[in-house]
């Protein structure tokens, strides 16, 4: 199978994989639609060992079948070894940022994995997104990273995926100075 020229490598957070199901609940429906669009448009899912373990523990039945299809079509990228850009050390070095030091390490793997691929994250995490944005300069984030929440607006997210999932067309964690 030949990949589309617009094929991108996207991180799909475990919270999206867990939420995506056949249920007609708005969040489940939104996450499912976005993951189905990734498959149709031949974008690739990026998984590190940490993320794969999280997926195995928390994924829905829909997500399990979706990942099986992605792997079968060779639409997956395994990051090995896991990226380590020093972000975790810089998070723990933040002064006067107790909340940030407590919250950001839980999801720093998403940011590091995105920086090691195409700078694209699908996640429902809004608090940590705000913290990464607030501390982008101190963390020395090298370039903007798209952080897209499928539950915010599924139709817009699906359209974004269908048109090539470009970083510049999404809400982003800014590059640090």
PLM feature spans:
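Short, surface-exposed acidic-centric catalytic microdomains
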Residues: 44-89
């Amino acid at each position: 199978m030949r990949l589309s020229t617009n094929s991108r490598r996207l991180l799909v957070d475990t919270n999206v994989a867990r939420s995506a199901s056949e249920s007609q609940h708005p969040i489940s429906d939104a996450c499912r639609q976005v993951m189905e669009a990734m498959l149709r448009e031949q974008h690739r899912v990026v998984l590190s060992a940490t993320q794969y373990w999280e997926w195995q523990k928390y994924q829905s039945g829909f997500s399990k079948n979706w990942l099986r299809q992605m792997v079968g079509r060779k639409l997956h990228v395994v990051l090995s070894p896991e990226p380590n850009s020093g972000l975790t050390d810089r998070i723990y070095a933040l002064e006067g940022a107790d909340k940030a030091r407590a919250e950001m390490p839980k999801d720093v793997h998403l940011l590091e994995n995105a920086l090691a691929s195409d700078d694209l994250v699908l996640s429902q995490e809004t608090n940590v997104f705000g913290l990464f944005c607030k501390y982008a300069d101190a963390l020395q984030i090298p370039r903007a990273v798209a952080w897209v929440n499928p539950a915010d607006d599924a139709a817009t997210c699906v359209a974004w995926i269908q048109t090539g999932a470009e970083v510049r067309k999404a809400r982003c964690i800014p590059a640090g100075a």
